[in-house]
Amino acid sequence: MAQDLSEKELLRMEVEQLKKEVKNPRDLISKTGKEIKDYVEAQAGTDPLLKGIPEDKNPFKEKGTCVLS
């Protein structure tokens, strides 16, 4: 699609997108960083990547062995 548009049309689309983006509310990283850190620390107890998965609920655990004779 972009190949069919002229450079002027592409620049107009980019300006339209930038006008939309400039309206987005922005917060200071000092505020949002603390919020993210607090959230991660609060969720750490239930995070399976940190805590691990119980053996009985592990979907990747070997079900058993198969013996072919």
Swiss-Prot record:
One of its GO terms (biological process) is G protein-coupled receptor signaling pathway. Coiled coil: none annotated. Belongs to the G protein gamma family. The keyword Endoplasmic reticulum does not apply. GO terms for cellular component: heterotrimeric G-protein complex. This is Guanine nucleotide-binding protein G(I)/G(S)/G(O) subunit gamma-T2. G proteins are composed of 3 units, alpha, beta and gamma. A lipid is attached at C66 (S-farnesyl cysteine). The modification Cysteine methyl ester is found at C66. One of its GO terms (molecular function) is G-protein beta-subunit binding. The keyword Membrane applies. Transmembrane segments: none annotated. Keywords: Cell membrane, Lipoprotein, Membrane, Methylation, Prenylation, Transducer. The gene is Gngt2. SUPFAM superfamilies: Transducin (heterotrimeric G protein), gamma chain (SSF48670). Residues 67-69 form a propeptide. Its main location: membrane. It is found in: Cell membrane. It comes from the Eukaryota. Guanine nucleotide-binding proteins (G proteins) are involved as a modulator or transducer in various transmembrane signaling systems. The beta and gamma chains are required for the GTPase activity, for replacement of GDP by GTP, and for G protein-effector interaction. It holds the Pfam family G-gamma. InterPro entries: G-protein_gamma-like_dom, GGL_sf, Gprotein-gamma. It is a lipid-anchor.
